[in-house]
């Protein structure tokens, strides 16, 4: 059960007069773009989009995270180091990394470099629903990505679908449709997808199962797994229409 704290009031008597009124910054911490409040959203966002250096870094971190492709060894610190040494600039650059590049980095040893290359190569075999989630399209998390793949069968067909096609799917909101349509209009996003497909990512779901007993259900995998690893179970669940999250919530089945 989620515990949501309630603010019942302020402790005015604790104030000594040194407090200052807080004002929302008008400029992104990157220093290049203004901060905008999107209509109907309470979260401020940088107007620079993917041109914002901070947003770009965070998108790469999310892409490689457990919620994304779960590239073992591709931590936030590793990504920051790769960016600092200009080894990557976009998410697709991850799949052009070579052992020879990594071994030259400070404090990188043979095993660390080899393991990361192996993890990167393994992530290319991720199912299309996981790749779709990793792209970080607003409002498209694991559950929605699975739902889209189940109904269309491939990432390319999802991108080709119009609003009317998407509206027919139970569970796909207007916010998802609008976000997906906006994302498709950015040429850089489509170039990224093309590059990922060239690197070997499978965009088409094989043996898509819509009416599976796992379809639409959310799972959390914990504990020690024998005779298999966590990623194998994730792939099995996702191929059968389910989704996997990292923590238990009210949506967990």
Locations of regions flagged by a protein language model:
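Generic beta-strand/beta-sheet core signal
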Residues: 1, 8-10, 38, 47-49, ...
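Catalytic cores of large soluble enzymes that bind and process phosphate-bearing ligands
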Residues: 19-20, 48, 52, 70-71, ...
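Conserved NTP-handling cores and scaffolds of large molecular machines
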Residues: 11-15, 64-67, 86, 124, ...
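DNA strand-break repair and replication-stress modules
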Residues: 105-253
């Amino acid at each position: 059960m989620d515990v949501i704290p309630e603010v019942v009031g302020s402790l005015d008597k604790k104030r000594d007069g040194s407090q200052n009124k807080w004002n929302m910054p008008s400029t992104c911490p990157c220093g290049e773009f203004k901060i905008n409040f999107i209509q109907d959203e309470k979260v401020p966002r940088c107007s620079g989009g993917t041109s914002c250096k901070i947003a770009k870094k965070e998108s790469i971190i999310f892409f490689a995270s457990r919620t994304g492709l779960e590239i073992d060894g591709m931590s936030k610190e590793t990504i920051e180091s790769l960016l600092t040494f200009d080894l990557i600039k976009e998410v697709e650059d991850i799949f052009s990394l070579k052992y020879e590049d990594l071994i030259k980095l400070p404090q990188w040893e043979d095993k660390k470099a080899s393991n990361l290359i192996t993890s990167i190569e393994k992530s290319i075999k991720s199912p299309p629903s996981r790749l779709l989630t990793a792209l970080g399209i607003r409002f498209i998390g694991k559950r929605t990505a699975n739902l889209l793949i189940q109904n269309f069968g491939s990432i390319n067909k999802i991108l080709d679908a119009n609003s009317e096609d998407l509206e027919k799917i139970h569970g796909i909101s207007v916010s998802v449709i609008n976000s997906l349509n906006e994302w498709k209009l950015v040429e850089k996003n489509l170039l990224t997808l093309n590059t990922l497909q060239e690197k070997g990512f499978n965009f088409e779901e094989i043996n898509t199962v819509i009416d599976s007993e796992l379809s639409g259900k959310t799972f959390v995998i914990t504990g020690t797994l024998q005779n298999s690893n966590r990623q194998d179970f994730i792939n099995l669940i996702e191929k059968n229409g389910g989704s996997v999250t990292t923590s238990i919530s009210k949506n967990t089945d």
